[in-house]
């Protein structure tokens, strides 16, 4: 029976088609055939075991949908609003992106196509799994909307964090950028372009882990539709690459441009170009000039170089996400400031440790060998720079330089040096060979070559050396084993150091002259007139009017002065205004002459021109002794604790 009906139907369909082709009157027959076909289709007797070859295959049923409930509004996405939801079966929190469906019949076909695109996208994203990618769970279509169920990430987006906390420090930027590149690398390896990377689409959880979200503009890239690539423009203008704005076709490199713009957003706290242009003006500017956004000046050199690699105007010259993960800005490996000195001690043929030497102990021994009384002069040098010399085995006497040796500069922290007492106690305990080896004044005749780095610090400290030592340093004159560094505060002083000390003595005497001027007596004025006969008495305050009476003449001035002369003068000549006892002590010092001082030029001329200098001096001393005796008698009468002003005994 079924075979008969099938043959009748086929014959009727064939005849109706022939009648239609011939254009004859077959309207009644065709209508009759159509009624038979419709009745057969509506019948449930199952006439056909297989569908006709021209009909599409039946669509597979979707997996059971998730039972969920919509909660509060938490944000707005690219295609609609985002709500918080809950899985009613597991209690898991969800993020539900709701896309409204337009009810208008005019845009019905366009809306249905857009919905199919989103469904295909979510079906694709359900297969992705990565720590830095938001997990998609599925879609649920309703009468007026399409709901996309996603993993809920607490904490908010990067843009919301920038509004709350301001711009991020560079360590935070590095951490977020590295995770962003890891997620983007995973997407690109799976043939997916994000095409809308920005701070608002990067979510951060409470542990600082970021997730790439809002793949509303992403698309499975098996082929780029045409040879020129994708032709649609999606995304936000401030983060758009020039090729996206110009619609010349773009690929994964457009996401790299957006990564660079996102780094600038995190560093400044604002979208790129937002301070210079509005959105429409930014589109025109980027499309016309292909310029990258301004790079903040306070970023590190590695960060600036990273941005330049991301924001190259030529898409083919931008680095991929995999290559950017190896950039020093992301890895944290800073470039060496001095690449020429990167060789370590062990890379050289004969490391210095084989000689039983230590750099710090060697420098400490150099400091201990100095003959100064303390480390004060050493500390004034600032930092001690020396050259680490790698000795080599040779038949010739001494050590030399090799081509492979490196000149590593060492800066010694003065806190590591021993204190003054240990230096003083260890001066005599140092080995003669060690002193000889590390004597910087010796030339190549010793077993070590000496090299001074001509840096500003060393040149400044070299001025503290004595003249004959500086000449040895420049001309390379060899010195004996006992030669050592001697600074300006040492016990042995040269004639060149005499000038500097002379200036200090003059300033000290000028200060004391002002004090003695207040206690001028007729006896002192008489002595001054005898010492300076050509200078009027009114010019007393403009010259060094006082000089100790026991100073020798110019022929007796010593060539070398001990280093303790300043301290002796300061201790022996206190201010005479304090008490009469100090005045007496000052008078005794003026007679004793234990510490010689320098005589100024005006006094020298006065001594040479005065023929009766010795007689006047003897007379002055006698009168001074008489005045002192009268003062002692007054003190004895007044009592042991009595104090009588010196002004009461004038005349």
UniProtKB/Swiss-Prot annotation:
UniProt subcellular location: Cytoplasm, Cytoskeleton
E.C. no: 2.7.11.25
Protein name: Mitogen-activated protein kinase kinase kinase 3
Active site: 196
Catalytic activity: L-seryl-[protein] + ATP = O-phospho-L-seryl-[protein] + ADP + H(+); L-threonyl-[protein] + ATP = O-phospho-L-threonyl-[protein] + ADP + H(+)
InterPro entries named in the record: Kinase-like_dom_sf, MAP_kinase_kinase_kinase, Prot_kinase_dom, Protein_kinase_ATP_BS, Ser/Thr_kinase_AS
Keywords: ATP-binding, Coiled coil, Cytoplasm, Cytoskeleton, Isopeptide bond, Kinase, Microtubule, Nucleotide-binding, Serine/threonine-protein kinase, Transferase, Ubl conjugation
Coiled-coil boundaries: 105-130, 618-641
MF annotations from Gene Ontology: ATP binding; MAP kinase kinase kinase activity; protein serine kinase activity; protein serine/threonine kinase activity
UniProt-listed CDD domains: STKc_MAPKKK
Assembly description: Interacts with NACK2 and MKK6.
Region of interest called Disordered, as start-end residue ranges on this chain: 573-608
Pfam families given in the database record: Pkinase
Example GO BP: cortical microtubule organization
Keyword ATP-binding among record annotations: yes
Any single Gene Ontology cellular-component annotation: microtubule
Family to which the UniProt record says this protein belongs: Belongs to the protein kinase superfamily. STE Ser/Thr protein kinase family. MAP kinase kinase kinase subfamily.
Role summary: Involved in cortical microtubules organization and stabilization by regulating the phosphorylation state of microtubule-associated proteins such as MAP65-1.
Presence of the UniProt keyword Transit peptide in the record: no
Tissues where this protein is expressed: Expressed in roots and flowers.
Ranges of residues in domain Protein kinase: 68-330
Gene source species: Arabidopsis thaliana
UniProt feature, compositional bias: Polar residues: 582-608
